[in-house]
Curated annotation (Swiss-Prot):
Region (COB intron 1 encoded): 132-410
Upper classification of the organism: Eukaryota, Fungi, Dikarya, Basidiomycota, Ustilaginomycotina
Membrane-traversing stretches: 32-52, 75-95, 112-132
NCBIfam families, per database record: grpIintron_endo (TIGR01453)
SMART domains attached to this UniProt entry: GIYc, IENR1, IENR2
Topology in the lipid bilayer: Multi-pass membrane protein
EC number: 3.1.-.-
Record region (COB exon 1 encoded): 1-131
Any one of the GO BP annotations: intron homing
Residue stretches making up the GIY-YIG domain: 196-286
Descriptive protein name: Probable intron-encoded endonuclease bI1
UniProt xrefs under Pfam families: Cytochrome_B, GIY-YIG, NUMOD1, NUMOD3
Main location: mitochondrion
Amino acid sequence: MRLLKTHPILGLANSYLIDSPQPSNISYMWNFGSLLGVCLIIQILTGVFLAMHYTPSVDLAFISVEHIMRDVNYGWLIRYLHANTASFFFIFVYLHIGRGLYYGSYKSPRTLLWSIGVIILVLMMAIAFLGFNGQKYMCFYNIDITIIQYLSIPTLITPSTRLKPILDKHNIKPVLLFENLTNSETKKIAYQALKPFSGIYMIVNLITEKYYVGSAVTGNLYMRFHKHLFSFTGNKRVANAVNKYGLSEFAFLVLEIVPQKDKIDSTLLLNREDYYLETLKPEYNIAPLASNSLGWKHSEESLAKMRENYSEERRQQVANINKGKTLSEETRELIRKSALLRKSMSSETRMKCAVNVQPVTIINLDGTNIMNFVSIKEASIAISCNEKTIRRALNGNGIVKKNYIVKVIK
């Protein structure tokens, strides 16, 4: 018995397990330590059973969870036990700490035990945040069951040996991707997969490794797919490249699916497109902005990109449309009569016009991109908003669409 108390290791075990001093006012608050042990055992057991069916892969992770919920016997119960026990574990930890602080469990002879507990708590909190990746969260925060159904098609998410090095080079992890675009079956799959969603897409040239980045609202992703690669009514630089290299040398990727329900989501969509434009700097894009690029001072490079869309022959055709044509005497007489018979403007109309042509200046929030307009109407068209919005801003703080500052030119 003396050895049990005097031995360095046995004495430590004896003081905590056998002769452990307990307070005289012991209550149910001392149950949380044992409850934590029960939670830990449940977590380990359910975690092992879930690991038997879960696949830690970008391609199959969501599908394997659905498999556990639908196909595995009592898989739904095991998953919910694992998730909810984790929540209760944290609750019991805080109650356990609170009890220790209230009853002074950090004092001698339990100072060492309390110190070990604090170390375990800090490690637990640190481990909880390990592996968190903000960019992945942005890309997959809105994945739902419909996307899981589409991800069950292997061709949508498995890049070819030609595309994979390009994706790895830029650290791109697409949600969906389509290659072999000359195959009619690929077009059908794209229609089925892209139609319900909105988000950021990317068109990649597999030969030159150049690419185009754009965004589409709900229902328009497939339209963009068809517009750029098949009907050639989208980006002219992409259309010229497809005609030059062939459709089989291109791939269509969905970089991120963004929900599209209200104006706030529309702003989020444009902000995400701006993020990819700034990060990836696509060669096929002409304007470096996602939304209205009015007022942007183009560089020589972007001007050259715009000139590529119009050959010299086409320029001459446009210039010669009305060259050498003259109006007949009948047409001239009709124009003259119309001008002479036009009624003079009333004083009320003149007052309305004077109010509407109030000159304004629009500036970005960061003080860049100053644009002057002769009227509020022109300014509203330029930044895609209603005239009332600008008038309301002029009477208030002067901020329009959370992106611009509007001021009256005096």
